[in-house]
C-alpha cells in the first residue's frame, strides 16, 4: 500500500510540474511562432542537430520541446567558439523516465 501511495504522489508531482513547465515554456516569441503557419513546424531542428544560428527552432519531443544547449569548444589554435545542439534537458529526461515507468506499472 505504501508503494502505491509513493507512486501516486510521484505521478501527481510530475503532472503538476509538467503543466507548470508547459506554461513557462510558452514565452512571447514562442507563442508567436506557434501561431505562425505550419511550415515553421516542418522546418524545426531535430534532436541532436545544430541550432547555433537558430536557438528557438528546436522541434518538440514526446512530452516537451527540445532545448538548444550550448557549449564552448576550444580548437587546437586556442580559438573559442560556441556550438549548440537541440537536446532534452536533464529534468525533462527525468520526467519522461518517470512517466515511462508509470506507464509500465499501470499499463
Swiss-Prot record:
It is found in: Secreted. PROSITE patterns: SPIDER_CSTX. GO terms for cellular component: extracellular region. Its main location: secreted. Belongs to the neurotoxin 19 (CSTX) family. 04 (U1-Lctx) subfamily. GO terms for molecular function: toxin activity. Disulfide bonds join 44-59, 51-68, 58-86, 70-84. Residues 1-20 form the signal peptide. Residues 21-41 form a propeptide. Expressed by the venom gland. This is U1-lycotoxin-Ls1k. Keywords: Disulfide bond, Knottin, Secreted, Signal, Toxin. The presence of a 'disulfide through disulfide knot' structurally defines this protein as a knottin. InterPro entries: Spider_toxin_CSTX_knottin (IPR019553), Spider_toxin_CSTX_Knottin_CS (IPR011142).
Amino acid at each position: 500500500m505504501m508503494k502505491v501511495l509513493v507512486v501516486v504522489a510521484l505521478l501527481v508531482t510530475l503532472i503538476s510540474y509538467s503543466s507548470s513547465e508547459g506554461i513557462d515554456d510558452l514565452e512571447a516569441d514562442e507563442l508567436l511562432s506557434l501561431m505562425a503557419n505550419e511550415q515553421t513546424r516542418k522546418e524545426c531542428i531535430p534532436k541532436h542537430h545544430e541550432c547555433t544560428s537558430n536557438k528557438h527552432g528546436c522541434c518538440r519531443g514526446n512530452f516537451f520541446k527540445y532545448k538548444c544547449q550550448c557549449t564552448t569548444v576550444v580548437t587546437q589554435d586556442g580559438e573559442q567558439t560556441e556550438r549548440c545542439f537541440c537536446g532534452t534537458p536533464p529534468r525533462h529526461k527525468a520526467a519522461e523516465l518517470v512517466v515511462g515507468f508509470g506507464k509500465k506499472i499501470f499499463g
